[in-house]
Swiss-Prot record:
The keyword Transcription regulation applies. Belongs to the transcriptional regulatory CopG/NikR family. InterPro entries: Acetolactate_synth/TF_NikR_C, ACT-like_dom_sf, Arc_rbn_hlx_hlx, CopG, CopG/NikR_regulator, Ni_resp_reg_NikR, Ribbon_hlx_hlx, TF_NikR_Ni-bd_C. It comes from Desulfotalea psychrophila (strain LSv54 / DSM 12343). This is Putative nickel-responsive regulator. One of its GO terms (molecular function) is DNA-binding transcription factor activity. The lineage of its organism: Bacteria, Pseudomonadati, Thermodesulfobacteriota, Desulfobulbia, Desulfobulbales. Signal peptide: none annotated. HAMAP family: NikR. One of its GO terms (biological process) is response to nickel cation. Its cofactor is Ni(2+). Binds 1 nickel ion per subunit.
Amino acid sequence: MLKRFSISLDDNLLEIFDQHIAEKAYNNRSEAIRDLIRKNFVLKEWEEDRDVMGVISLIYDHHQSQLQKKVTDLQHDFHHHIVSTTHVHMDHDNCLEVIIVKGRAGDVIELADGLAALKGVRDSNLAMNSTGKSLH
């Protein structure tokens, strides 16, 4: 059941918020506010080291000596947190690895940081998501 409430905003802040709504193609302010609240709760789950889901993406140099082995070894060290991986050959030199992860936020961050720190990793990103259990 949805509950209605009102908020007051400075004109400038409301203008910025309305621009955000237009850029993201929200149908209305309410859905945009719900989304912002959910995102805040997801961040809180990560800060509190709760069970979370995430996606680690890596772009790395295919030719870097022993890098693929190190990536695989580190994933095996965290095997209980890895749901799935996908490996894409982007071109002759670069690979993209996408790793779907779950578990305590601290463990997921440790894995993501470990992978990002490997020599030959050109770019890495951790998309922090919720399990969805607390977002009802």
